[in-house]
């Protein structure tokens, strides 16, 4: 049988760095050849060799309704008929902004952009402009896009300036980025004690989705809110992943914490390129043209993206939408854990509504970045390829979250569990815990 994905990947490497337009897609973390997809429908992907996969990537989070949802496709098609881009305001921008604010009351005003990276980058610029301060606090293992000031690894301790984690990022660009330990409030308090008058904002994922999946402890987020109140800094929630996925009001509604600013993306575009950031009215009013903080974008508020996003968010109001999604997520994750336990496979998991993370480790709970990176990457790599060979598409990295959509039914979940049970039953002995 001809492997068309392999042929396309070889060809792609002649024209694109690594053959892809986003690094993780190249399968570098797991090895092998990335599948080239030609079609997606509901909970399934179909590759160029006509192989069908149950999809637990969901375009890295946006496809909460599943692929090619009829209402979203119809809205996008109708919008396309009227033009692809105007460079001028359109009515759906207002409708989408209003619905975002209705779902997430902390967002009193919102600015549309084109990606999650733009959203976090612009939110930080706004925070610095409003406070007149330069330093920000981020957390090791939290990914906020590829803006220079956010491409920072943790130092050897909490009280360190950031060091660039990519060539091409000047040291001076990240000298105002301070790194603390996720779920460790003391590390944040120590930074405030040393740099209190200089810290403009804390930016944090309330549920971290790029060091596998690690939810923040409730008292950790409460403590961040209190520290920001105490020192006059802004609290920014990066809900690019969690916004409208873990709950209609995002993770902030689950934790009952009101951030000053929120970054959004993924779901609000229904699969189209989009991002947004918003928050308190008096802060957002500092944005140009109303205020002095400048931010702009040629394609911001794109009419097709606005139509797709609006159609998606409307579907989230369906009765029992989130309770059903949470139930399916729990059915999948608990089913995986029970099968791992029966086969003596060292595996743990974290999950929230519509999102999950699997870590090959004997630790019962993973709550810190250091634990996540100590998971057995080789075990994941083996598991990933066995799942792929059996028609289940997982994220090709041990440190990425998985996603489940409203289009997944118990049929897909149970098929996945049957495949996993079979894989675990015949796995190499190195996947087993000694008893």
From Swiss-Prot:
Cofactor: pyridoxal 5'-phosphate
PROSITE patterns, sorted: AA_TRANSFER_CLASS_3
One family name in Pfam for this protein: Aminotran_3
Major location (coarse): cytoplasm
One record GO biological process: protoporphyrinogen IX biosynthetic process
Gene Ontology CC annotations of this record: cytoplasm
EC number(s) from the headed UniProt entry: 5.4.3.8
CDD domains, per database record: OAT_like
Superkingdom to which the source organism belongs: Bacteria
Cross-referenced SUPFAM superfamilies: PLP-dependent transferases (SSF53383)
N6-(pyridoxal phosphate)lysine, modified sites: 266
Gene3D superfamilies tied to this protein: Aspartate Aminotransferase, domain 1 (3.90.1150.10), Type I PLP-dependent aspartate aminotransferase-like (Major domain) (3.40.640.10)
InterPro entries in UniProt: 4pyrrol_synth_GluAld_NH2Trfase (IPR004639), Aminotrans_3 (IPR005814), Aminotrans_3_PPA_site (IPR049704), PyrdxlP-dep_Trfase (IPR015424), PyrdxlP-dep_Trfase_major (IPR015421), PyrdxlP-dep_Trfase_small (IPR015422)
Molecular-function GO term, any one: transaminase activity
Keyword set, alphabetical order: Cytoplasm, Isomerase, Porphyrin biosynthesis, Pyridoxal phosphate
Enzyme class at the top of the EC tree: isomerase
PANTHER family: GLUTAMATE-1-SEMIALDEHYDE 2,1-AMINOMUTASE, GLUTAMATE-1-SEMIALDEHYDE 2,1-AMINOMUTASE 1, CHLOROPLASTIC-RELATED
Protein name: Glutamate-1-semialdehyde 2,1-aminomutase
Organism encoding this protein: Coxiella burnetii (strain RSA 493 / Nine Mile phase I)
The organism's taxonomic lineage, starting at the top: Bacteria, Pseudomonadati, Pseudomonadota, Gammaproteobacteria, Legionellales
Gene: hemL
């Amino acid at each position: 049988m001809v492997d068309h994905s392999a042929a396309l990947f070889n060809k792609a490497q002649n024209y694109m760095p690594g053959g892809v337009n986003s690094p993780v897609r190249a399968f570098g973390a797991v090895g092998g050849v990335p599948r080239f997809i030609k079609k997606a429908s509901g909970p399934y992907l179909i590759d160029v060799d006509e192989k069908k996969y149950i999809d637990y990537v969901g375009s890295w989070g946006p496809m909460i309704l599943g692929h090619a949802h009829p209402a979203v496709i119809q809205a996008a098609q109708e919008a396309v008929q009227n033009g692809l881009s105007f460079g001028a305001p359109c009515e759906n921008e207002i409708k989408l902004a209003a619905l975002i604010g209705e779902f997430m009351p902390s967002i009193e005003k919102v600015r549309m952009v084109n990606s999650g990276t733009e959203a976090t980058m612009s939110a930080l610029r706004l925070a610095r402009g409003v406070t007149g301060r330069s330093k920000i606090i981020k957390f090791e293992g939290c990914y906020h896009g590829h803006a220079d000031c956010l491409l920072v690894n943790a130092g050897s301790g909490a009280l360190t300036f950031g060091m660039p984690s990519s060539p091409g990022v000047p040291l001076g660009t990240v000298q105002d980025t301070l790194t603390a330990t996720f779920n460790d409030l003391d590390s944040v308090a120590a930074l405030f004690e040393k740099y209190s008058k200089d810290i403009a904002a804390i930016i944090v994922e309330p549920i971290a989705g790029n060091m596998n999946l690690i939810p923040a402890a409730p008292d950790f987020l409460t403590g961040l809110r209190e520290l920001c109140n105490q020192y006059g800094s802004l609290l920014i929630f990066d809900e690019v992943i969690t916004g409208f996925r873990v709950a209609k009001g995002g993770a902030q509604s689950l934790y009952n914490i009101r951030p000053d600013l929120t970054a959004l993306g993924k779901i609000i575009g229904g699969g189209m390129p989009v991002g947004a950031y918003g928050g308190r009215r008096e802060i957002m009013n500092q944005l140009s043209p109303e205020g002095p903080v400048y931010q702009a974008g040629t394609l911001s508020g794109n009419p097709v993206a606005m139509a797709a996003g609006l159609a998606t968010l409307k579907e989230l109001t369906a009765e029992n939408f989130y309770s059903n999604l949470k139930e399916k997520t729990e059915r999948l994750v608990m089913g995986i854990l029970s099968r791992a336990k029966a086969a003596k496979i060292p595996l743990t998991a974290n999950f929230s509504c519509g999102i999950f993370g699997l870590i090959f480790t004997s630790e019962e709970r993973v709550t810190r970045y250091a634990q996540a990176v100590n998971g057995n990457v080789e075990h994941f790599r083996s598991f990933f390829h066995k799942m792929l060979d059996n028609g289940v598409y997982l994220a090709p990295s041990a440190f990425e979250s998985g996603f489940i959509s409203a289009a997944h039914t118990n049929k897909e979940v149970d098929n996945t569990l049957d495949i996993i049970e079979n894989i675990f039953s015949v796995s190499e002995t190195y996947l087993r815990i000694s008893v």
